[in-house]
């Protein structure tokens, strides 16, 4: 399964510094998990089995909650049992169609 999620503090003292720092701690948790992942300006995407992915999301959320009593969490999942490599394969497929139809 692939899960795209965004976690951020909604209450911080210095908005610019603390929000980025809290999000960085969440991303650090995801990267340390060893699961395939990517981070962009809106979401962090992680791939793996249900229990392992949601354990990482919980740990990342807890990292943000450590600096904010109120936290926003958005989750979107593509659940396809037994399918791996979708983080890159989906994008590669779209790019292939774009290249073929120039």
Sequence positions of predicted segments:
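Charge-rich, low-complexity N-terminal segments
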Residues: 1-102
